[in-house]
Structure formats: structure tokens, C-alpha cells
Amino acid sequence: MSEPLVIVGNGMAAARFCEELVERACGRYAIAVIGEEPRLAYNRVLLSSLLADEVSAADVELRPARWWRDRGVTVLYGQPATAIDPAIRRVRLANGASIPYSKLVIATGSRPIRLTAPGMDLRGVRVFRDFADVADLRCAAKGARAVVIGGGLLGLEAAYGLVKGGAKVTLVHLMDRLMERQLDARSADMLAREVEARGVEVLLGAETTKVEGIRRVEGVRLADGRVIEADLLVVAVGVRPNTDLARAAGIDVDRGIIVGDGLQTSVADIHAIGECAEHRGQCYGLVEPAHEQARVLARRLAGVNAHYRGSALATNLKVSGVRVFSAGDFLGAAGTEAIVLSDPGLKTYKKLVIANDRLVGAVLFGDTTDGPWYFDLIRSGTSIDAVRNELVFGRTFASLPADCPQNNHDEKLGNEPPERAASLTYAISN
């Protein structure tokens, strides 16, 4: 008889875990997925494209209903879990039902961070996190005067989508550059100019102190006294792990649900993966680590002695229509050397950081074709001494030895082939 396995959460981590588990242990488990949102699992990365009307709702769905049925997976979407009872091994639902489990996987993701400035409870204040948020913003965008708070990925994508939807948009960011965790000063400046060219006003070093209005948003007040008129405010200042169910069940929680290398929580037969999990003090909040955790846990529950050791991080994204990539120490610590290649004509920028004949960091803007290959070099620690002079021009121009890591991600990412610049700025600094 199949063991009852329950997954709380129906996002990208849960979907990947199901895919991996049914492939490796078909029939071993009777799988039930509990989802808070009233729809099947979807690709959250594409929400910005959905907001910008570049893809359809069908395009963001990860798997059709038939796929889940054919593999014997029961999906209870639109039925939030309200409690986990480890003593009797049951999950309670909002409708009063409860589901038994032999093994439980918590994949509850994260929640948007809410600001506490006065006026944040007014009508017209929105977040940008899930499918319902996209639907709300698409309805509100036409002709709106919108302010987006947050210059990270979510804020930029919200601003871009709102402009495409017909809104006049001002983006307000507390820090002195956009995407400060993923980009250096120069690439962030290039991004700001590209975002403004697409119709978004960008205000950096700007702190929001109050939302003006009586019943609904009328404006946003900044610390310097300026007031930006607005009837729509989107708060996109980050997310935090959704740990409520785990904490209430007595599972150890810090910032996220604490897991070991086996993705096991402090309670027997309860695991956690994705944005809600904290491994070795790290909460990732990114898709690829969630997928890696899902693969490891599926292997373990299929009887394989697999372990999760953490994830090397890289950013490879399309932000407001512009491709950006970063990995490793792209800012350059003391004792490192930076090689920079810039082409204002093609609006491309590449910075490689080298230490002890090893590539330790990279940031790319505009053309990210070689990003995954650089990431392989960073992770492997391969000596780049033999191709040092050609490395900045990309894999096509750097004839590495056969045993060096090769990038096999290009087809998956759909990157365009590299273009050569007519005029380049090439610099080395240390």
C-alpha cells in the first residue's frame, strides 16, 4: 500500500519535487498537494511577463491538470492548510477537513514584506507577488498614476508591467542604485537609464515616510518633503519565509524553517524545501536553490542517500526587458583584479573579477550569453591563466582545455548568440 505523503504548498518547489518523486518512486507514495491559491502550480518567474501582457495565463502554468491526474497526484488547490498536528500526523484545512500523512513536505514559500509607514492600509496599496496580484494590477494600471516602492527585481518588473499597461510610473528606491545586491555601480546605472528609457521615473536614495490620502491613496511623501501624486501604490521591498504553520506546530524556526542536509526539520518525517526553508543559516529566496532542494529530497524519499550542501548563487534574469547576470564576488574584494569590457553602442557591459588566476566573480549587462559558462568557472575554481587575455571576450574566443567545465545551459535559457561590438572600452584594474 502506498504511503500517504502530503505537500503543503503548491508553488515551484512543490511542483519540481512532485516531478522528481513520481519519476524516481512511482507508486511508492500516495501524494496530496495542498495549495492556498485557487489554481494549479505556475511559474512565478513569468508573472512580470504576464503583467506586461507578454505571455498568457496558460503560458505560466507549470503542468496541466491531466499531468497531475495521470500520475496519481491529488491537488487540493484553493484549500489553505490551517494547522499541522505532528502528534497524530494530520494536516488540517480551512474547510474543516484533515488529511493524514506518513511524510510531510512543507513548501509554503514566502510572503511579501509589508511597510509600516502611515497610510499603508489605504485603498490602492498593493503588493506584487502572486497571480491574483497580477490580475488586480492589470485592472488598475490603465491611466493610473502609480508609485512602486522597491528597486529590486520585483519592483522593477512591477514598474515595467504597469508602464506597459498604461500607467504613469515612478519607482522609489531607498538605496543609491538599483538591484544593489546583484549589480555593481556601473551596471546598475546602465539599468536605471534603460528603465527610464522605457518610461519609468527612477528616484534613488529616496525614503518613503507616509502614504497620503483619506480613504485611498492620493500620494507618497518622501523623507526630503517631496510628495509624489499617486492613486496606485505597489510595495515590492522583498519577501520573508512563510513559517507560520511550522512555528505553530512546534517545528524549529529562525528566519526560515530550519533544515539539515537531508532537508529534515526538527520533527520526524517533516521536511521543508524552497523559500520557506533555512539551511545552514541561509534562506535563498531563488528558484534554482529550491529546485536543487526538491531534487535532493525526492532522491532521499526514493531511497537514495543524497544530501543538500547548499547552493552556489548566480543571477541570470531579464529585468524590464534587459538581460543581467551576476555571480560570485562581482564587486571585487581586496587583492582581486577586475577586467572590464564595455560597449556603449550595443549597451553592453562585462566585468570579470580575478584572484590567484581564478575567476571569482562576474557581472554582465545586456549580453549574458556567457554568464552560465563564467558561473561554471567560478564554481569549479579552474585556472584561467591560459586564456586570461581572451576570457572577457567570452567562451567563443577563449580556447580552454578540454577538461575545463563547459556550459550546457544556453539552449535551456534561450540566450541569443553573442554579438561583437564595433567599438569597445577595455580596462584592467586592481
Indicate where each model-derived feature is located:
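Mid-to-C-terminal Rossmann-like scaffold of FAD/NAD(P)H-dependent oxidoreductases
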Residues: 2-4, 23, 276-372, 428
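FAD-site-proximal beta/loop scaffold in flavoenzymes
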Residues: 121-142, 213-221, 226-299, 386-392
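Cysteine/selenocysteine-centered motifs that mediate thiol-based redox chemistry or coordinate metal-sulfur cofactors
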Residues: 137, 384-430
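A Rossmann-like FAD-binding core segment of flavoenzymes
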Residues: 30, 75-92, 99, 165-260
